[in-house]
Design a protein with these regions (language model features):
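Helix-to-loop junctions at the C-terminal end of transmembrane segments
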Residues: 58-71, 161, 273-285, 370-371
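Helix-loop boundary and gating motifs at the non-cytosolic
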Residues: 1-57, 66, 77, 88, ...
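Juxtamembrane intracellular "pre-TM" segments in multi-pass secondary transporters
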Residues: 1-6, 196-228, 410
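Structural signature of the two symmetry-related core transmembrane helices
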Residues: 74-89, 288-303, 383
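Helix-loop junctions at membrane interfaces in 12-TM secondary transporters
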Residues: 92-108, 305-317
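Transmembrane alpha-helix termini and helix-breaking/packing motifs in multi-pass membrane transporters
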Residues: 32, 36, 64-67, 91-96, ...
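Helix-loop junctions on the cytosolic side of multi-pass membrane transporters
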Residues: 172, 187-204, 394-406
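Intracellular juxtamembrane helix-capping segments at the cytosolic ends
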Residues: 116-130, 326-339
Length: 410
């Protein structure tokens, strides 16, 4: 792409995320919303697992469709708008006489159908519109925007929700109205981006059967390694999505205001991390930095498990917020590079499906594991799994050298 188009896209990718971050900050209280609607631990875990089921079932068919579709822009825009409009249902849930917590799960379940379409276009799109030399800086800018905005918004929303707890559910309904408006502003900027047709080879015979997808997975050692390693690495944070609201609210008795502070501090740490990780990646390479950060990240789970104190957890959250960008920025760049341009849509579709399977299983086991060993022991166990996942990138390396990574798939 021309430099002017790249610059324009980078600008819009940062601006749209500002508005999307405000919406995300509001929706981050969805688990607390379900708990206050009377949802059980199992219902809270379904918020994550239901979305994972939909994405797991639909991503590969949509990715196969996108692999043979050069003009993916209409699919991108329409799926994004549909997804965001479907969140209107959250506003009206309190008017239901029964099954209100369950209704939230149903809404999020259905909303993830357009998300699956969106992701099959959005993820490979970055490789098409942003040169690899500029991706780390772009992802850093997006992450800083996301972190700074969510830090302020989550803290403000948490304080506001806590200021008049008796206003429930009206305060949450207003919160989701704000989220809807902000998400529409984000969508408008996405529609202004310059997105070229994706590379396809219409003359090539592509086997999209299960056997063909298995061959795609096994023939590329780097691709299969990053998929397996990432699956194990992410079990802990996936389970934590459902576990942390239960652990913080029901066990440690965290308030809405504390949750807002926690979200804000975690995102504040991400801002700091995004300021220094890209420079280290330019000096030492994506893979080395990702591996180091992945191993270090296990300390968060050990810390909040062995020190169940809400004030101390805020300090630990600042730390993990700083560490996570070192994993996320490097990992996405590596993943894009190990997938060939012509097969990138389907390869990423398979990757996302495997990850959603892990997300679903990780979320569903939270409730029975809490009943079996208790939330505190479960948090510590997740720390062990996170450590194992980080070490896999050492014993089962994705690439042998940074030079090989930069040459891959280009």
């Amino acid at each position: 792409m021309q430099a002017t188009s790249v610059d324009r896209n980078i600008r819009f990718l940062v601006i749209e995320l500002f508005w999307a971050a405000i919406a995300s900050a509001a929706y981050s209280f969805a688990a607390a919303y379900v708990i206050r609607l009377g949802g059980s631990n199992f219902i809270v875990s379904l918020i994550t697992s239901a979305a994972a089921v939909v994405n797991m079932v639909t991503t590969i068919p949509f990715a196969a469709l996108m692999e043979r579709t050069a003009n993916r822009r209409p699919w991108l825009f329409r799926s994004l708008i549909t997804f965001r409009l479907m969140h209107i249902g959250l506003i009206f849930v309190p008017f239901l006489p029964y099954w209100r917590a369950e209704a939230v799960v149903v809404i999020l379940l259905l909303a993830n159908i357009p998300v699956a379409i969106f992701n099959t276009v959005w993820l490979p799109m970055f490789a098409d519109i942003i040169p690899i030399q500029r991706r780390a800086r772009l992802f850093s800018a997006r992450n800083v925007t996301l972190g700074a905005t969510m830090m302020v918004a989550t803290y403000g929303f948490g304080r506001w929700l806590e200021s008049d707890a008796n206003a429930f559910p009206g305060n949450y309904q207003i919160l989701f109205c704000i989220a809807l408006i902000m998400s529409m502003l984000s969508t408008w900027y996405v529609t202004r981006m310059d997105i070229p047709d994706s590379p396809i080879d219409p003359a090539a015979h592509v086997d999209r059967s299960l056997a063909g997808m298995w061959k795609l997975f096994t023939e590329n050692k780097a691709y299969s390694s990053i998929t397996i390693n990432t699956l194990i690495l992410n079990i802990a944070p996936w389970a934590a999505i459902a576990l942390q609201p239960i652990y913080f609210v029901r066990v440690l008795h965290a308030s809405d205001e504390w949750l807002g502070i926690w979200f804000a501090i975690t995102n504040g740490g991400a801002i700091l991390g995004n300021l220094f990780w890209p420079r280290l990646m330019e000096k030492y390479g994506f893979y080395r930095i990702m591996t180091i950060a992945a191993v270090i990240s296990c300390t968060y789970f050990f810390a909040i498990g062995f020190v169940p104190n809400l004030t101390a957890i805020l300090v630990f959250s600042l730390f993990i917020g700083m560490i996570n960008p070192g994993i996320d920025i490097a990992h996405f760049n590596i993943l894009l590079q190990v997938c060939s341009p012509q097969r990138r849509a389907l390869a990423l579709g398979i990757f996302v499906t495997v990850m959603n399977f892990g997300l679903m299983v990780s979320s569903l086991i939270v409730s029975p594991m809490i009943d079996l060993i208790g939330p505190q022991a479960l948090v510590i166990g997740l720390g062990v799994l996170r450590l194992v996942g980080g070490l896999l990138f050492v014993v089962n390396p994705v690439v042998r050298s940074e030079t090989h990574l930069m040459q891959t798939a280009e």
